[in-house]
Amino acid sequence: MNKLIDFSKGLVPVILQHAQTDSVLMLGYMNEEAYQKTLKEKKVTFFSRSKQRLWTKGETSGHFQHVESIHLDCDQDAILIKVMPQGPTCHTGSLSCFNSEIESRFKIQALAQTIHQSAKANQSNSYTQYLLKEGIEKISKKFGEEAFEVVIGAIKHNREEVINETADVMYHLFVLLHSLDIPFSEVEQVLAHRHQKRNNFKGERKEVREW
C-alpha cells in the first residue's frame, strides 16, 4: 500500500478508529518513515509537527495503538487505521480525542473529564476534591448510598427519583474510578468485548462474565 501513497506532497493525515466499536479516536500525521515504522512494529507512529520527529503514540504513557488493519481513501491522500487501543487515546484520559462537540448533548465521557479537571483544580468548595481527600472508603460508601436510593425509587415506581438518583450514582461511580486510577475507557473496552457476545445465559450457577 505504501507505493500508492504519495508522501512527496508532505505529511499524510491519519485517522485512528477503534477496531471493535468503530469510534473515531484521533487524527495524526505521517511521513513515509513514520508509516514504515508503523507497518514494521504494528504500533501507530506519527510524525509530530510540534516536536519535528517521529512519535510513537503511547511512548510516554504506555497507551499504544495496536494496528489491526490499514485502509487508504479513494484519492490516496488519507489513511484510516483500525486499532486496538492499549488504554485511553486522549491525554485527558478519554478513549477518544473527539469529545468536544459543538452544540451537542451531554455525553458520559464529559463527566470523566469534569471530574479529572476538578481533581486537579485548587478549589476549596469542590465536592469532588472533598471526596477524593476523604478516600476510597468514603467514596464507596456514598456510591452505595446513591445506588440504594435508585433501588428505593424503583420499588416506588418513582420515575423522576430513579432518573435523579441514577445521575448521582454515575457521578459517584466516576469519582470512584478516578480515585482508583481506572480510566472509563477500560470499562468501555470490556463493554465492547461483551457486546460482541451473544446467548450468554447465566443459568443457575455460572457467574456472569459475558452478556
Swiss-Prot record:
Subcellular location: Cytoplasm
Stretch list, region Phosphoribosyl-AMP cyclohydrolase: 1-107
Primary location: cytoplasm
Protein's pathway: Amino-acid biosynthesis; L-histidine biosynthesis; L-histidine from 5-phospho-alpha-D-ribose 1-diphosphate: step 2/9; Amino-acid biosynthesis; L-histidine biosynthesis; L-histidine from 5-phospho-alpha-D-ribose 1-diphosphate: step 3/9
Keywords: Amino-acid biosynthesis, ATP-binding, Cytoplasm, Histidine biosynthesis, Hydrolase, Multifunctional enzyme, Nucleotide-binding
UniProt GO cellular component terms: cytoplasm
Catalytic activity: 1-(5-phospho-beta-D-ribosyl)-ATP + H2O = 1-(5-phospho-beta-D-ribosyl)-5'-AMP + diphosphate + H(+); 1-(5-phospho-beta-D-ribosyl)-5'-AMP + H2O = 1-(5-phospho-beta-D-ribosyl)-5-[(5-phospho-beta-D-ribosylamino)methylideneamino]imidazole-4-carboxamide
Pfam families, per database record: PRA-CH (PF01502), PRA-PH (PF01503)
CDD domains: NTP-PPase_HisIE_like
GO molecular function, one term: phosphoribosyl-ATP diphosphatase activity
Entry's Gene Ontology BP terms: L-histidine biosynthetic process
Matches recorded under PANTHER family: HISTIDINE BIOSYNTHESIS BIFUNCTIONAL PROTEIN (PTHR42945), HISTIDINE BIOSYNTHESIS BIFUNCTIONAL PROTEIN HISIE (PTHR42945:SF9)
Family indicated by similarity: In the N-terminal section; belongs to the PRA-CH family. In the C-terminal section; belongs to the PRA-PH family.
NCBIfam families: histidine_hisI, PRK00051.1, PRK02759.1
Protein name: Histidine biosynthesis bifunctional protein HisIE
Organism: Staphylococcus epidermidis (strain ATCC 35984 / DSM 28319 / BCRC 17069 / CCUG 31568 / BM 3577 / RP62A)
Gene that encodes it: hisI
